[in-house]
């Protein structure tokens, strides 16, 4: 009873299902037969097919000859290996699935297996047979040797000419120091005859020595007298190099210019002194004092002035010397010692002194200094009338 009740319930259920799907069912037997056939087909399909979860693409060589490693398609709905043999990828459509068994690109293609080509005969290079570097080395070596030879030659020539130049400088120094005997005697005579009466005053000897050292840079005594020589002996002048100026000519030009300066200073001194002597002889004196420059003198030369009578005017002669005259310090400091008439008488007076030696003592120098006449300009005012009978008040 129970089994029959179950079967009836089952059939009723099937009938209801068939009506809901709109399937025609003419009879219960036909419906039962149709339903039985459908159930059998569903059972066969469930047993033969399983759900697809992933697909694996094999590794292959692509069209460039590069190896692509294998990979698995299991991301989301992309579960199938699709594409071509040379390019593979994952897709979600089963009908686009690639049959990988038909592809042949799983091995290395023969065209990609290229070996190293054999070397050509033209590309072979033998360093031992190449002579280009050797030629370059030879040229550079020759140039370096020539440069060294030139440098050493120049150094040798300079060393060879150096002793000659030293000998020339020494010979020039000897020529300037040595003078002819005749010229030395003539200089002594001229200095003895034309010596000035004021050249023995040594009150300002220190200042005179400094001025003389600045003018000609010549040493005392014999060195100074030798520097006054106009030209050395022709036989003693060394032969200079043809391409450079002679040192002897330079020295001679230097001393000639210094000599001209000394002569000009002497002319200025004697011009002022002669003007004062003329005014004193006429009996008239200027309103203002006449400035007299220091008379050039040579403190190392012997003195031999000539004696003149009183009342006669002495002619002033020039002595080629670069030392200025040293006046006594009491010439202007004590103006009351001499009067105007004594000045007039003193200007025309010359004292004679014999030649002295260089070893004169200081006492003799003081006596000679006190014996020399002193220039004095009166401090009293007077007027110039150019008259012989002028009277000073």
UniProtKB/Swiss-Prot annotation:
Biased composition (Basic residues): 310-321
Glycosylation sites: 38
Residues spanning the signal sequence: 1-20
Family matches, as Pfam families: Shisa_N (PF13908)
Key word Cell membrane present: yes
Membrane topology: Single-pass type I membrane protein
Keywords: Cell membrane, Cell projection, Glycoprotein, Membrane, Postsynaptic cell membrane, Signal, Synapse, Transmembrane, Transmembrane helix
Function description: Regulator of short-term neuronal synaptic plasticity in the dentate gyrus. Associates with AMPA receptors (ionotropic glutamate receptors) in synaptic spines and promotes AMPA receptor desensitization at excitatory synapses.
Sequence similarity: Belongs to the shisa family. SHISA9 subfamily.
Protein name as it appears in the record: Protein shisa-9B
Source species: Danio rerio
Gene name per UniProt: shisa9b
